[in-house]
């Protein structure tokens, strides 16, 4: 077993070194803006001023939603102040960071987005309002987080909407003489999937032609709703294709240009309650969630748990992830080491960059984000 584990470690190291070796071969794409992004949710305890822009190039304001009658973005009076503060903060920070606002999110009305994408007048009203909001509040771009188109028709409608969106952005830039707005989308960890609906695939050609990049949500892969523990954002999974690398490769094999892909990483872990505290590896039987809302624990909370409970911390070679356990509580998560592995693979695959979900969950000194930024700088 020791030899097998050592071999796996060596394979991981070899692939990271491959990323470093690609420096010369990627020089032709050096003009492309690399992405070190993070999503920010409205949080009085974590205002925009607390974000360290030396670690990030792009900050995503989350979330705005369209009105279900006018189909235009609905901006509340409180959001007006929040949006103004957000963009002004990141334009005046040193270094400054680009800002985008994100539309939708996990709790949004997927059916409304589906209707907007399918109805040309509604789609035009929606798109024009997004450009107006971006220019009014000084954003550099727009991000769509539609979770998720439910069938092939909705995917096709998404592709057409992206085409119309890009055209409107290009026309606005040509008319005003301003640099065109960025247009991005947050997408499922794999290019094709069947959860939350019928089997379907993202509109690859439209993504390549109309989006600056997609933020691939390479997390929420395992959770306490399952009856066994697992890596919430495992880099690998030898028993299935539910892993970060598998998902990214599905996008690349589908024809999406690697430099259109930005890998997502979570700043949180997921907790389980073990059925038997003496059985505590990956795949151990469980009986629901542990601490946190639905088992979600911020990275800083995981560290507090480890310290207060004198938890045992293990690195799992098969998934390149970390887990802690104490008593019946089991937590799967990423730490600076596993994030370095992921960044190495992102570079080996020649991705555009990475992003984190979500600001406020790292430690106060940004342990995870700092290590990711350092790892990326290696090339």
UniProtKB/Swiss-Prot annotation:
Domain GH18: 34-379
GO CC term (a single one): extracellular region
EC number per UniProt: 3.2.1.14
Residues modified by glycosylation: 68, 109, 128, 192, 227, 241
Outcome of substituting residue 296 to G: No effect on chitinase activity
Reaction(s) the record says it catalyses: Random endo-hydrolysis of N-acetyl-beta-D-glucosaminide (1->4)-beta-linkages in chitin and chitodextrins
Effect seen on changing residue 289 to P: Confers Nod factor hydrolase activity
PANTHER family: CHITINASE, NOD FACTOR HYDROLASE PROTEIN 1
Family as reported in the entry's similarity comment: Belongs to the glycosyl hydrolase 18 family. Chitinase class V subfamily.
Name this polypeptide is given: Class V chitinase CHIT5b
Organism: Medicago truncatula
């Amino acid at each position: 077993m020791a030899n097998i584990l050592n071999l796996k470690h060596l394979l991981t190291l070899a692939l990271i070194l491959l990323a470093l070796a690609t420096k010369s071969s990627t020089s032709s794409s050096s003009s492309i803006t690399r992405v070190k992004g993070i999503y920010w949710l409205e949080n009085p305890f974590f205002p925009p001023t607390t974000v360290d822009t030396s670690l990030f190039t792009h900050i995503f304001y989350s979330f705005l939603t369209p009105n279900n009658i006018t189909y235009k973005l609905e901006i509340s009076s409180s959001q007006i102040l929040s949006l103004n503060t957000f963009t002004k903060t990141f334009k005046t920070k040193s270094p400054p960071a680009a800002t985008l606002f994100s539309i939708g999110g996990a709790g949004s009305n997927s059916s409304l987005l589906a209707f907007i994408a399918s109805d040309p007048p509604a789609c035009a009203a929606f798109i024009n309002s997004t450009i107006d909001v971006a220019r009014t509040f000084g954003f550099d771009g727009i991000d769509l987080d539609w979770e998720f188109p439910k069938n092939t028709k909705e995917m096709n409608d998404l592709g057409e909407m992206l085409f119309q969106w890009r055209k409107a952005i290009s026309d606005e830039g040509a008319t005003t003489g301003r640099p065109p707005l960025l247009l991005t989308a947050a997408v499922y960890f794999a290019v094709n999937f069947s959860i939350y609906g019928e089997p379907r695939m993202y509109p690859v050609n439209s993504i390549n032609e109309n989006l600056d990049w997609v933020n691939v949500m390479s997390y929420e892969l395992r959770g306490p709703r399952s009856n066994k523990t697992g890596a919430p954002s495992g880099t690998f999974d030898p028993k299935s294709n539910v892993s970060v690398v598998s998902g990214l490769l599905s996008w690349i094999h589908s024809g999406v240009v690697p430099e259109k892909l930005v890998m997502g990483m979570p700043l949180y872990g997921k907790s389980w309650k073990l059925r038997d505290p003496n059985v505590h590896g990956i795949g151990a039987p469980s009986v629901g969630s542990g601490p946190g809302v639905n088992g979600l624990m911020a990275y800083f909370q995981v560290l507090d748990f480890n310290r207060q409970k004198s938890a045992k911390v293990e690195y799992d070679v098969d998934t390149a992830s970390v887990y802690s356990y104490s008593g019946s509580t089991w937590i799967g998560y990423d730490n600076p080491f596993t994030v370095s592995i992921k960044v190495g693979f992102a570079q080996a695959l020649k991705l555009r960059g990475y992003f984190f979900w979500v600001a406020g969950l790292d430690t106060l000194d940004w342990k995870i984000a700092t290590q990711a930024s350092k790892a990326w700088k290696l090339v």
